[in-house]
Amino acid sequence: DWDRRLIGIAFIILAVHVSEEWYFPGGFHVQYNTMRGSSRVDRYPMDRLTDSTTVLVAMALGLVFIPLGGGIIMIAIMAFALFEVIGHTLMGIRMYRDLAIHGKKTIYGPGTTSAYGLYLPLAIIIACYAVHTGMGVGEWILGILCGLACVAAAVIIPELAMRNENSLYPYTDPGYYRRYPEALRGAAYPLNS
């Protein structure tokens, strides 16, 4: 029954992770949209609608996966967790390079703490569990493919379907990136509030 528990923990981590990206300190959209080459980092390609849809799809997938449990689902969760760690690392490096001349001293960006502090340990625990229980190569491959399919369903497809340079759902607060106004290309944030 540990597989279901670990999958449940993954979705609790998702709530913590999204809270860091959106609110504490918030501003994940700035780094994500910068990585995607946006000239309007408050709304394109990620806006509040696409980001909320991503989380809704991920949680819906959780409602399906938790009861199923099993090794393939656990490997999919591990792949997703590693995707988060790698993604936040790459975005952090990019933002550090762009903003070091403006005083940025680390690769931290919204979501990095929970990616490293929660998702990375979860991925390691799942990998150890998978090895310990003797999961076969086929399960590993199917799990990784399932994880990639989940990323496509939760992130890529909603963004492709709903992105809009003139979105009516822009972010209204740059969060962490308020301290780096140079990062806020094309955004219409109330910076004096």
Model-derived segments and their meaning:
Residues 2-12, 66-81:
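Interfacial segments of alpha-helical transmembrane regions
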Residues 15-23, 78-95, 149-175:
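Transmembrane alpha-helical segments that form the membrane-embedded catalytic/substrate-channel core
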Residues 30-51:
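Juxtamembrane helix-capping/reentrant segments at transmembrane boundaries
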Residues 43-44, 89-117:
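Interhelical loop and helix-boundary elements at the membrane-water interface
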Residues 47-64, 114-124:
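Core segments of transmembrane alpha-helices
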Residues 54-76, 126-144:
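Alpha-helical transmembrane segments and their membrane-interface junctions
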Residues 116-136, 189-190:
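Hydrophobic alpha-helical transmembrane segments in multi-pass integral membrane proteins
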Residues 164-193:
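Short, highly charged, low-complexity non-transmembrane loops/tails of multi-pass membrane proteins
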